Amino acid sequence: MAAKVDIFAANLPNLTDEEMDMCRKAFAMFDKDGSGTIDTKELRTALSALGQNPTEEDMFVMISQVDQDGSRCIEFKEFVRVIQINKQMSAKDADEADTLDAFVALGGNLDKTGRILVDKLRSICEEFELTVNVDRLVKDADRDLNGFLSYDEFRALLS
């Protein structure tokens, strides 16, 4: 089981004034009894209203991180943290998609199988006049030293 993170001290992305205003409106809309809390079902609906569609796993992770008292109800400050966590997860998903796109462009497969030639990576860097020491990067990433990079090796190289 993953360690519980103190998300109130965690470095989460800031929300813009517009995003905070949308959070207030969405929270108020779903806090029908004015109790200052919404339940998990209402949380999913509120997130959808804000254009966020987390998976069941994402919902579980977010709720377990913000529901400090285990009430299964979310207060406004916890709701804001949920939005921040979801925003952070979305950014990570976008980064993963960019990595996969680059892997495929270099010869890998969409299902993260296949491999890319280190020589092809080197020639692309040279073609775009990138001042990257490919050999030094690959030395750490190409674990089996076979001149190819698997998806995991390529992702490690970019991180």
From Swiss-Prot:
Which Pfam family, giving just one, matches this sequence? EF-hand_7
Q: Which residues bind Ca(2+) 2?
A: D67, D69, S71, C73, E78
Alphabetically, the GO molecular function entries are: calcium ion binding
Q: What compartments host this protein?
A: Cell projection, Cilium, Flagellum
Gene3D superfamilies according to UniProt: EF-hand
Q: What's the main place this protein lives?
A: other
One Gene Ontology CC term in the entry: microtubule
Does the keyword Calcium belong to this entry? yes
The family database entries (CDD domains) matched by this protein are listed as:
EFh
Residue intervals of the EF-hand domain: 18-53, 54-89, 129-159
Q: Does the keyword Isomerase apply?
A: no
> Which of this chain's residues are annotated to bind Ca(2+) 1?
D31, D33, S35, T37, E42
Mind listing the UniProt keywords for this protein, alphabetically?
Answer: Calcium, Cell projection, Cilium, Dynein, Flagellum, Metal-binding, Microtubule, Motor protein, Repeat
Per its UniProt entry, which superkingdom is the organism in? Eukaryota
**Oligomeric form and interacting partners:** Consists of at least 3 heavy chains (alpha, beta and gamma), 2 intermediate chains and 8 light chains.
Q: What does this protein do?
A: May be involved in the calcium-mediated regulation of dynein motor function. Binds 1 mole of calcium.
Q: What is the name of the protein in this document?
A: Dynein 18 kDa light chain, flagellar outer arm
Organism, by scientific name, is Chlamydomonas reinhardtii
